[in-house]
Amino acid sequence: LWAAVNERLLAAPAVSERARDLGTVEAIETVRWRAQPNLLWARVHTSVGAIGLGETYYIPQAVEHVIHDLAADLLLGQPAGAISSQWTALFSCTNFFGFAGAEMRALSALDVALWDALGQVTGVPVYQLLGGANRQSVQAYNTCVNAGPNRDWDHAVDDPGDLAAELRDLGYLGMKVWPWDKFAPQLVARGSTGPAGWSSMGPVGSYLSFGDLASGLSMLERARDRIGSSFELLVEGHSRWDINMAVRICRALEPVNVLWVEDICQPDSAEDLTRLVRETRVPQAVSERLISRFAFREVLRHQAAHVVLVDVAWTGGLSEAKRVADLASTYHLSFAPHDCTGPVTALANLHLAIAQPNCIGVEVVRGFVDGYYRQVLDTPLHLANGRLAIPDKPGLGAALSADFLAQDDVEVRLSK
């Protein structure tokens, strides 16, 4: 046995030679689309012909400048397969301002692109590079957005029980709604166009009346009355309430038996989150708004979360999202990747969910999956019976389609 092992080791190329075989970063492109003005795609071209694809979300012009004015100087000419080294180099500049914002979104997109390129060159799906498959498919829950062919938010408002039954029969794990956003202080009028999140942003609310509490609760009660225990209900809070109102909401939710409440208060205080966990019996999911493992460490150290939510496109790419998921596992907690944004993030989430044993499920907006995702990608996500199937192509398993890139409303910028 040892003779055979030694023979293979001697026959294998040196590590430095294998690294060269993966190529170097030759060019970096960013792609923006006027029809989805909050998305940015990053394409990393390598010297061996691979084109890795990444993505991030929100104020893409700022992220684009970070990529071309900062990251390109650090990445061009560097080994494309040395992902950890490139991540560390980029993070050393990003964390100069507190490792968040446009810098971290740029790092996230580029990191995912490097993983995609590595999978293409090595001929394996990204989940294999992350440790291999723990499952063959992942169950999804649907976030109820009006998008594409589906008007799920309108449906949730008008008849939440009917929507819950429909999604249950389609195989989904559950549905996520945000019943109390409309009662929080508003930055702009609902329905206003502008940066993503405007309709769910605003000053933190310090008072929710009993009547408004009951009004929001009725959406979930009507759904639960219709579907009983056969389907999960999830609540999104968008961090709109102070800790006292968060406690009030969560206590009211206890009889409904939701799978979790997500970001009902700001996630920047581990002490507040600890109070929420101790004073209510509703599972708390924390938080797509936490950036990097260092922010998650404080929450977990305080035992202030039941489920860890990670956004691959914001928190540092696949590299950092896997670190956070592994950190959650040391506390025996499940994790769930966040995505209400774009198709590449959905793909990256899928690979991480396939590889990570403590994944509870993935988020999708079915109107996006059945809508514009199909226009952007050359290979659509396979969502059937409420589950996303294991990808079988190298890398992430999809690229931006040639027809999409040729559209007049698509803008490309190149650094090389």
Predicted regions and their residues:
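Conserved, mostly hydrophobic/aromatic
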Residues: G49, A71, L110, G123, ...
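C-terminal extensions of enzymes
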Residues: A3-A4, G371, L377-K416
